[in-house]
Design a protein with these regions (language model features):
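Conserved C-terminal RecA-like helicase domain
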Residues: 6-151
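Secondary-structure transition/capping motifs at alpha-helix termini
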Residues: 36-40, 71-77, 143-146, 164, ...
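Short secondary-structure boundary/capping segments
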Residues: 69-74, 94-104, 168-170, 185-189, ...
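Conserved beta-strand -> loop -> alpha-helix junction used to position metal-binding or nucleic-acid-contacting
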Residues: 77-87, 183, 198-209
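Switch/connector loops and helix/strand junctions flanking conserved nucleotide-binding motifs
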Residues: 88-96, 162-163, 178-181, 191-198, ...
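A short beta-strand element within the Helicase C-terminal
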Residues: 150-154, 158-185, 200-204
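Long, hydrophobic alpha-helical segments
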Residues: 192-242
Length: 242
């Protein structure tokens, strides 16, 4: 329960950016991975590793930190990370670029891809390969388990515009407003069928009660035409027809 009277900024510093909190998030994802990644029951057994996930976190430093923790604590999961160039560079930018380069090296080595670092735009080439892999698009659509990527860690990248029916869950270690929240949740909502994937899942690690209200508000906004705030939705005339 985080109802401690601390501001969101204080919670970020004292709790959410702490190593024990992040270790607990990794442990929770690891503990529930088989359930969230398994497909429908086939001959009495759930097929493992049929679905992928995304972990959305607060800023580049958190992306790099979580990636390192997954490598240490959950090496059996195939995890990749990315962040965009236009996210706040701030202090430690060179360290963060080095962390991204190392993650790219890990990825290229594990999957035996070409060397993206030799491309004109290495980050774009890496992101393109990663999104194809997690969406199981050509050439990763043959059901070859060696091609499988389990989890992508992001800050802002891929929270809009990207979706895949194979992304079954988004884990949220960040607070989002209603508009961005609907966008992020929509990354998981492409269904397969009523048995394999009837709906996507979202798991919140920050202020569950607050986020529950935000989800309710976001759904009101969404049903009233996709405004960015609840106030905007309230100003939408109801007599406009469907």
């Amino acid at each position: 329960n985080m109802d401690s009277g601390l501001t969101e900024k204080e919670l970020e510093k004292e709790v959410y950016a702490s190593l024990p909190f992040r270790q607990a998030v990794v442990a929770d994802i690891q503990r529930n991975w088989a359930t969230n990644a398994s497909g429908p029951i086939n001959m009495g057994v759930r097929e493992p590793n049929q679905f992928q996930g995304m972990l959305a976190v607060s800023g580049k430093q958190a992306v790099a930190s979580y990636y390192s923790l997954f490598k240490q604590l959950a090496p059996e999961l195939r995890v990749a990370m990315t962040y965009s160039r236009d996210e706040d560079n701030g202090t430690g930018a060179s360290d963060l670029q080095a962390a991204l380069k190392q993650a790219m090296q890990d990825y290229m080595t594990f999957y035996g891809t070409r060397n993206f670092l030799e491309d004109k735009d290495p980050q774009r080439a890496y992101l393109n390969d990663m999104t194809k892999r997690i969406a199981r698009k050509k050439p990763y659509n043959k059901g070859n388990d060696d091609d499988r990527l389990d989890l992508i860690i992001v800050s802002d990248q891929l929270l809009t515009g990207f979706d895949s029916k194979f992304v079954n869950i988004i884990y949220m270690d960040k607070i989002l407003g209603e508009g961005p929240l609907i966008q992020a949740m929509s990354r998981t909502n492409r269904t397969i069928d009523k048995i394999a994937k009837p709906y996507g899942k979202v798991r919140f690690y920050r202020q569950g009660a607050v986020m529950e209200e935000k989800v309710k508000d976001a759904l009101v906004i969404y049903t009233k035409g996709g405004n960015d705030t609840l106030a905007d939705a309230g100003n939408t005339p109801d007599d406009q027809g469907p």
